[in-house]
Each structure stands twice: as structure tokens, then as C-alpha cells.
Design a protein with these regions (language model features):
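Short, polar loop motifs at secondary-structure junctions
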Residues: 18-24, 94-98, 147-152, 195-198, ...
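Nucleotide-sugar donor-binding patch of glycosyltransferase catalytic domains
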Residues: 128, 229, 263-302
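A donor-sugar binding/catalytic signature common to diverse glycosyltransferases
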Residues: 90-97, 102, 112, 234-278
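Conserved nucleotide-sugar donor-interacting segment of glycosyltransferase catalytic cores
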Residues: 79-135
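Conserved nucleotide-sugar phosphate-binding/catalytic loop shared by glycosyltransferases and other
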Residues: 6-73
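C-terminal amphipathic helix plus adjacent low-complexity
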Residues: 300-330
Length: 330
């Protein structure tokens, strides 16, 4: 999205606040715009506690994390207000609640861009009264550009505009280059992205496939698997070069798989949170994915590689144009 905003508006500058672990990636990806981009660290204290051994959420630990985070939000918002640079024309968030409190206080447009908010997620672990401060912060947003695979009506932002799906642009020549390098005759090439929470050494993988995988995964012995370099800024092209995608239920990779027209396997957690449940529900409606448990990974077969029946459009430029219009750029 940042790339699309900067491409569409040559006069635009961005102050991009993101997790310290994302700063290097953001700098590399946006390197042709660095004269117009300021990168600064931001750490959200919200955390879903995941039980790796059982591939499920630890509800008690997550509840503690949510309550601690909500208690700290007012002070965090004050700190963000102090850090707000001069000359800002809009605050965009995906989907940090403090951003909207800061925008409201500064008299700026507060624009959300997401398929969910942390309010719906927190509601799965805490009572309505406990998360009311979170609702109040989100209600200060002026607008949500609401992606598909959404938690929908449960989102506490009143003004919503459907935004479809977006991802970074695909590059056909780069996709062909990756496929020539890794695709072997008579073998399916699978994009594997399940984060660091799943121990594949313990669970195993189907040896009938070859894999391109992202960091945080330890593939078991006897599997042909190639690590995508951690510094790669075009993982969407690696995904598009593969014959199918195996991923946990995260929005970005699911959206990329749908937009790249790839057969999709979604690995479910044992007790999914609100965003995961919303994504799975919509994928079921579309018949766009095969749902699997982590333990089924060694048993996948090529017969399950069903082509996508629906076609999706990358709305990245449209969403960027809507943001720029709200920010007063034409």
C-alpha cells in the first residue's frame, strides 16, 4: 500500500511507523522512495499467546495480554500524540487503535485499512465492559477501507467502504525466473508459509512435493525445500511461481494466493480467533480453500490441487486513491 500511495502522488511524504523487525524490509522494499519516507519503530503490546505444541491459542495468557495492553493504551496514545510530526495531513492505520485517538486529537482524518480490528479479537477473550476503552478508540476513526475476508459488522468503526483484496504487484518475468530455478518436472512446487508457530520437524510434510518456504519454519529431513532469502522483498512472486499454497489463516498470504489464482490449503488452529474465523467463513462461502489440520500435512496429495473457481482483482491502486482523496490530494 505504501508503494501505491507514493507512486500515485509524487508530492507525498510518508512517516511509516512499524515493528522494529519490519524496518529493514520496509526500507529495502521502498528504497526508490527513501527520500520521501521516514521509517520509525513502533511496538504494539498486544499479543496472541500461541501454544505451539497443540497448535492452539492459550486463552488464559492471551486474556492477560489483552487486559494489560488495554490498560496501557491511553498512555501510549499520549506518547504517539507527542511524536506526531508537523505537517501531517492524515493518519492511516492497519489497525492500531492509538492512531485514531491521535488523529482525532490533532483534527486530522483517521483512516483504517484492514479486514478486522483488535476489538473483535479481544472480544473473544474478554467481556464487553473490559474492552470498552478499545471500542471507544476505534469509534474515533473517520473511515475504514474494509478488505474482503472481514469480521464485518462486528467492527466498531461506523463508516466502512468495501475495499476488496490487495497485494504487492506480481512481476511476470520475475515469476518465470523463480519457476525456472526451482520447478522440477513431474513435481508440484508448493509455497509454504505458516510462521514460526508450527513445528514441521515434529509433524512432517508430504514428500511428493517440493517447497519454497519462508523463515521461521524448520522442514523435516528428506524433504526438498528451499528457504526464501529473509531479505527478499518480493515473496508474492515466489508464491505466484508455485503450483499451490499452504499457509496459516493470515490475511496477507491468503489474499496473495487468491489474487495469484493458486490452489490454497489453509492450516487451521484448534481454536481460532475472530480474524481467522472470519477468513475461514468467507473462504468456505467461495469454496476457495481446502481446510486442513496441522497433522494432515504429511498426507496431502496432488489430487487436492484444485484450481481457483473465482477470479479476484488487485484493488491496491483503487484503495490508495481513496486514501489520497481523503487526505486532500485531489
Amino acid at each position: 500500500m505504501s508503494e501505491a500511495l507514493l507512486d500515485l502522488q509524487p508530492e507525498l511524504g510518508l512517516v511509516l511507523r512499524c515493528h522494529p523487525g519490519q524496518l529493514e524490509f520496509a526500507g529495502n522494499y521502498l528504497r526508490r522512495f527513501l527520500a520521501r519516507v521516514e521509517l520509525t519503530p513502533f511496538v504494539s503490546q498486544f499479543q496472541i499467546a500461541f501454544d505451539e505444541a497443540n497448535w492452539c491459542i492459550d486463552n488464559a495468557l492471551t486474556r492477560q495480554s489483552v487486559l494489560r495492553w488495554i490498560a496501557e493504551l491511553p498512555q501510549t496514545a499520549v506518547g504517539e500524540q507527542v511524536r506526531l510530526p508537523a505537517g501531517i495531513r492524515a493518519v492511516i492505520s492497519d489497525i492500531v487503535p492509538e492512531a485514531f485517538a491521535v488523529a482525532k486529537q490533532a483534527g486530522l482524518p483517521g483512516i483504517g485499512v484492514s479486514n478486522y480490528t483488535w476489538y473483535e479479537v479481544a472480544a473473544g477473550f474478554c467481556g464487553p465492559g473490559e474492552i470498552e476503552p478499545l471500542r471507544t478508540m476505534y469509534e474515533q476513526a473517520d473511515l475504514l477501507l474494509n478488505y474482503e475476508l472481514s469480521t464485518g459488522a462486528a467492527i466498531p468503526i461506523r463508516s466502512k467502504i468495501p475495499a476488496g483484496l490487495i497485494c504487492r504487484p506480481f512481476n511476470d518475468s520475475r515469476i518465470a525466473e523463480i519457476r525456472i530455478r526451482y520447478k522440477q518436472p513431474e513435481r508440484s512446487l508448493i509455497f509454504l508459509s505458516v510462521g514460526g508457530a508450527l513445528s514441521l520437524e515434529r509433524i512432517g510434510l508430504c514428500a511428493d512435493f517440493d517447497y519454497l518456504y519462508t523463515r521461521g519454519i524448520n522442514p523435516p529431513a528428506g524433504i526438498t525445500a528451499h528457504l526464501i532469502a529473509p531479505e527478499a522483498t518480493d515473496t508474492q512472486n515466489y508464491l505466484a511461481a508455485c503450483d499451490a499454497v499452504i499457509t496459516k489463516c493470515g490475511w496477507s498470504t491468503v489474499a496473495e494466493a487468491l489474487l495469484a489464482d493458486k490452489p490454497l490449503f489453509v492450516v487451521k488452529s484448534a481454536n481460532g480467533w475472530a480474524e481467522e474465523q472470519a477468513i475461514l467463513s468467507r473462504l468456505r462461502d467461495w469454496r476457495a480453500a481446502v481446510e486442513i489440520e496441522a497433522g494432515q500435512l504429511p498426507c496431502l496429495n496432488c489430487q487436492a490441487l484444485v484450481p481457483q473457481q473465482l477470479r479476484f482483482e488487485n484493488n491496491c491502486k483503487t484503495v490508495a486513491s481513496q486514501i489520497l482523496q481523503r487526505a486532500g490530494f485531489g
